[in-house]
């Protein structure tokens, strides 16, 4: 993937950049890892490994030309303990390092949550695994809000720390936040998504703090516009600003309260003041009630569509068949 990305960057750089003045970047997911115990050097190092094995796996080669040293050390040692002659982590030639390094005009960041990290040794006998290679354990604070997805906890302060990490680690590149949002479970049909508005408010506020820290953030995009297919979770999780009724063949969309709230944040380029933000929240909740009524009526609409599209044609077909049978019966009697 890294070499393919570099190929695209160099192709654009050589053939089109001078005319189009465009940019080529890459979007990477990265969650923040916080040490469980700040007095423990092992926990501090484990938290660093968590980030390097996550974001650094791809970002470090692009900015520095090679995999993070901690990845090379840990995976190399685990590979040797498992009887392998070489590390399971691929190596780059000098030419490849040079070719990959610097192929990023901007960095896209997808961020959703944070974990507490502590040191945990995994014997080589556990077998090769990305998770056991890291020698760490992920923990969560039970007090963190958990809106829907079992992996996604709302931890806004981790966002600011991750953005500052990118600034320090990679020379303060231009950043576009390409994914940030929160989900609810498929069974939820509530359009007044107060928890999503709170998530956006707190996470965007932490991003603004990072900008004041000097992080070169240029843009922000919520994840996502519509409820849709979510990787391993399929349609069982909803991240959308718009509710999609997957039961209906027409897949109608209904705006959640967060639509108006997010719209006001973006059009104002942030939060004018606390009172105004609270007013946005109140208006968004007020406007979602009518949408909820539409959504509540939708099962009836779907039922009527089913009657029109399935039941009526079936009854007509049966009537035609019965008429044909009756006609055949009359003809036989006549003969």
Where are these regions (language model features)?
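Active-site region of glycoside hydrolase catalytic domains
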Residues: 1-297, 313-316
């Amino acid at each position: 993937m890294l070499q393919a990305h570099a190929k695209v960057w160099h192709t654009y750089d050589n053939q089109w950049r001078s005319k189009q003045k465009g940019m080529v970047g890459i979007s990477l997911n990265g969650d923040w890892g916080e040490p469980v115990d700040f007095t423990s050097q092992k926990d501090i190092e484990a938290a660093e490994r968590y980030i390097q094995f996550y974001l650094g796996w791809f970002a470090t080669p692009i900015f520095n030309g090679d995999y993070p040293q901690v990845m090379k050390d840990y995976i190399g040692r685990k590979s040797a303990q498992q009887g392998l002659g070489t590390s399971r982590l691929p190596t780059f030639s000098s030419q490849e390092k040079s070719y990959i390094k610097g192929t990023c005009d901007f960095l896209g960041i997808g961020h959703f949550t944070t974990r507490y990290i502590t040191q945990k040794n995994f014997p080589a006998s556990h077998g090769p695994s990305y998770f056991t290679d890291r020698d760490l354990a992920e923990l969560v604070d039970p007090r963190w809000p958990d809106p829907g997805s079992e992996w996604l906890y709302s931890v806004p302060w981790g966002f600011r720390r991750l953005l500052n990490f990118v600034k320090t680690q990679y020379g303060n590149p231009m950043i576009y936040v390409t994914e940030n949002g929160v989900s609810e479970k498929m069974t939820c049909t509530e359009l007044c998504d107060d928890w999503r508005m709170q998530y956006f408010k707190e996470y965007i506020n932490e991003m603004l703090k990072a900008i004041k820290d000097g992080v070169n953030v240029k843009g922000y995009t919520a994840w996502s516009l519509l409820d849709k297919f979510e990787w391993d979770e399929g349609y069982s999780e909803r991240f959308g600003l718009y509710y999609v009724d997957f039961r209906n063949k027409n897949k109608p969309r209904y705006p959640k309260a967060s639509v108006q709230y997010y719209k006001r944040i973006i059009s104002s380029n942030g939060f004018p003041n606390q009172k105004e933000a609270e007013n946005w929240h109140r208006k968004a909740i007020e406007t979602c009630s009518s949408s909820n009524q539409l959504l509540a009526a939708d099962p009836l609409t779907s039922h009527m569509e089913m009657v029109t599209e399935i039941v009526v044609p079936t009854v007509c077909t049966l009537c035609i068949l019965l008429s044909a049978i009756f006609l055949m019966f009359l003809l036989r009697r006549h003969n």
